[in-house]
Amino acid sequence: MLIATSQFSAFNRSLFIILIAMFVSSCEPAPLTNGKPVTETRQFDDSITITSLYFYNDINVTLIEDEEFRIEITTGENLMEKITSTVENGALYLKNENIRYWLRSYDYPLDVKVYHNSIRHINYVSWGDLKSEGPVSQDTINHFDLIVEHGSGDIDLNLNCKTLNIKAYDGTAKITVTGYSDYTDIYHNTRNNIYAKDLISKNAKAHIDHEGSIYVNCTNKLEAIGNHFGSIYYNRHVKEINKTITQSPAPNSRGVIEPYN
């Protein structure tokens, strides 16, 4: 029995070594250090209007209004090649396609400045941060979408819109929006808060389906839909408010719909 066990262990070790060798030989060569920080500017075809931004992984994005569409990427020189920026059907896609994260230091920048004058839709699947340097647009935007599919970074946008649509479906991203909107529609299903106290909305709808809170500043009419998990806090000076609780209160109910001031 001892001999059989020893032979089995030796077989396992041999199999493990073979699998590791196959894995290493099949992997494409990749630098194991980040390299010194460098900045690269990427230009795009002037004839293409970019209206949407999709970004992923650990990329930090700053939106800057400018007439010339371009991006500036700052990261380690050994990582730059695998920071991809592709344009398809009016959308810019930003991804970090570097491999072997576990072999590198995590202390490196991965910052992308997006210079634009036409982005009106953002799709966020990231653990990086998103912010605007000043207003996303000096002109009033007819419609703006912020869609958080999943993420855990900080989002901070200054907006001036006729209609604003915020949908947060999963993750722990903290969302802060400031500015003005004629109509704001917020859906919250994540484990953090949405702060729209400094976004003055004429009319608004706030719907929460998870833990966390929505803070909304509405002056005219607010529709607030909550459950017993999350809370909606609103400006008490709103002219009209309709409150709906979608689930019956539980014994340990924490969710409320009430003024924040």
Place the predicted regions along the sequence by residue.
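Sec-dependent bacterial lipoprotein signal peptides
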Residues: 1-25
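Solvent-exposed adhesion/ligand-recognition segments of exported proteins
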Residues: 56, 83-89
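Short acidic/polar N-terminal linker immediately downstream of export determinants
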Residues: 11, 22, 26-79, 97-115, ...
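A broad, low-specificity signal marking well-ordered, structured residues that form hydrophobic/aromatic
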Residues: 5, 71, 83, 92, ...
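Extended, compositionally simple hydrophobic/Ser/Thr-rich segments
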Residues: 50-63, 112, 119-261
